[in-house]
């Protein structure tokens, strides 16, 4: 039996660059960095106080009126996923329960729509726990679990946990759009979005659904998340006074990343059903690969220096796409702007592409939007798909002295023949995902 072909038909990026593809693409073409001083909370006491905030976004503006009460039990991460899913569905020209007007019939039967969404460890709002924590402290000031269980927990709203379960991103998206097909949540840090997109690809290929919402979202603009990321040693704490130059992927002077919030949800559809409804697509999803890196010397807190695991995922994606390394025309890399990660990723690219690597442009969105964690791969694939559709390489910034052998130097946007584009991501835990997209006329 021939395997079903799958296309990307809707793009829903959400980040400091904007909400939806239009502002995001405009920023990518201009090379506009959106990093700035944090406003969501007072970050002045931290070693880093700049980030990539999503501004001018309110979840209740995209949630159906009948469902708006649920917004009060949505953490910021959930709100971002809901906003991205709404943008993606509208971009694909879909009618779903969440965006139907006048009782219009949905484009697809609910049982033929699925959702696989990458999610993070969601950080709680400090204000929601402060009173409970204070009531759990005895006279000596040491936290008392028994006191918390007897007194402190009574100060926590009964619905508190529903805001912070990672699967709630997918839950709210599926409820709003009434997707009753296969649904899953992937929580593998920065690899979550890529792995979720791969899961949706497999579900559609197997015929278990005709359409899937997939990708991911995360907000790292939270005091607890902020502290946790600083403790990993991956954050740039030296460039608070120049946020637009702080994230320098693949530059010899890279000094760490800057966190942000957002991600991207995309709509995948079986090509046959897409053609039946007369829809349009940005690109085909030709291949997917996943792997696990193991750096035993560093207990996985640092990447494998040789990038072996990343290379394995890329090769798997190329095999499924039935392509050779020389067929790739652009790469949207992980591009964390941390020297260990950048060099490991560069080693992986060198192992796969050899001398051809010098001719393949690398476009790293984190230089402009910061690291969106579990949502990063979703934002990356939105940019990759749009680049193929527009046959345009977005601008590259903050790389004046690139790692030897990489075409990552600062450059303006330019027209180019893009037949195939690779996206790849890795994570603090060593999970890797690689996706190959192809031009629609292939």
Q: Model regions: which residues?
A:
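Active-site-proximal alpha-helical scaffold in enzymes
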Residues: 81-94, 166-170, 174-177, 183-218, ...
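A glycine- and small-aliphatic-rich helix-loop capping segment at beta-alpha/alpha-beta transitions
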Residues: 22-26, 124-142, 204-206, 226-239, ...
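Condensing-enzyme catalytic core mediating Claisen C-C bond formation in acyl metabolism
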Residues: 5-9, 33-37, 242-323, 329-330, ...
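Glycine-/small-residue-rich "gating" segment that lines the acyl/pantetheine channel
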Residues: 137-156, 198, 202, 218-275, ...
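Acyl-CoA/ACP chain-elongation machinery
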Residues: 39, 210-255, 288-305, 333-343, ...
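Conserved beta-ketoacyl condensing-enzyme motif
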Residues: 8, 29-177, 181-184, 217-226, ...
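Active-site nucleophile and cofactor-binding loops and adjacent substrate-binding regions
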Residues: 42, 73-79, 108-110, 160-166, ...
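ACP-dependent fatty acid/polyketide chain-elongation machinery
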Residues: 1-70, 92, 272-284, 382-397, ...
């Amino acid at each position: 039996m021939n395997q079903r072909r799958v296309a990307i038909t809707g793009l829903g990026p959400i980040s400091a660059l904007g909400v939806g593809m239009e502002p995001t693409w405009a920023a990518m073409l201009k090379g506009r960095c959106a990093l700035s001083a944090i406003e969501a909370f007072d970050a002045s006491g931290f070693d880093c106080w700049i980030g990539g905030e999503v501004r001018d976004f309110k979840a209740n503006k995209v949630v159906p009126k009948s469902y708006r009460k649920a917004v009060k039990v949505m953490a910021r991460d959930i709100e971002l996923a809901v906003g991205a899913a709404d943008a993606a569905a509208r971009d694909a020209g879909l009618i779903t329960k969440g965006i139907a007007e006048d009782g219009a019939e949905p484009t697809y039967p609910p049982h033929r729509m699925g959702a696989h969404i990458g999610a993070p460890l969601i950080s709680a709002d400090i204000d929601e726990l402060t009173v409970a924590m204070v009531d759990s402290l005895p006279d000596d000031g040491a936290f008392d679990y028994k006191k918390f269980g007897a007194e402190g927990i009574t100060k926590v709203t009964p619905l508190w946990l529903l805001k912070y379960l990672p699967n709630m991103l997918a839950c709210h998206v599926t409820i709003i759009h009434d997707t009753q097909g296969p649904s899953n949540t992937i929580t593998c840090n920065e690899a979550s979005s890529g792995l979720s997109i791969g899961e949706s690809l497999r579900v559609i290929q197997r015929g278990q659904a005709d359409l899937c919402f997939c990708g991911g979202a995360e907000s790292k603009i939270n005091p607890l998340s902020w502290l946790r990321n600083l403790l990993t040693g991956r954050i740039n704490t030296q460039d608070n006074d120049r946020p637009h130059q702080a994230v320098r992927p693949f530059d010899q002077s890279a000094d760490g990343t800057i966190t942000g919030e957002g991600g991207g949800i995309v709509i995948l559809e079986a090509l046959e059903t897409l053609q039946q409804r007369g829809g349009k697509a940005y690109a085909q999803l030709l291949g997917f690969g996943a792997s696990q890196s193991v750096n035993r010397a560093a207990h996985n807190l640092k990447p494998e220096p040789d990038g072996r695991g990343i290379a394995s995922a890329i090769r798997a994606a190329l095999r499924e796409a039935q392509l050779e390394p020389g067929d790739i025309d652009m790469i949207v890399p992980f591009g964390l702007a941390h020297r260990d990660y950048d060099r490991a990723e560069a080693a992986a690219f060198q192992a796969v592409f050899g001398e051809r690597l010098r001719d393949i442009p690398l476009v790293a969105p984190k230089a402009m939007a910061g690291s969106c964690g579990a949502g990063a791969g979703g934002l990356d694939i939105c940019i990759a798909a749009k680049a193929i559709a527009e046959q345009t390489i977005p601008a590259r910034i903050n790389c004046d002295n690139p790692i030897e052998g990489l075409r990552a130097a600062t450059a303006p946007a330019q027209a180019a023949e893009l037949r195939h584009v690779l996206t790849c991501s890795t994570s603090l835990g060593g999970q890797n995902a690689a996706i190959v997209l192809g031009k629609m006329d292939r």
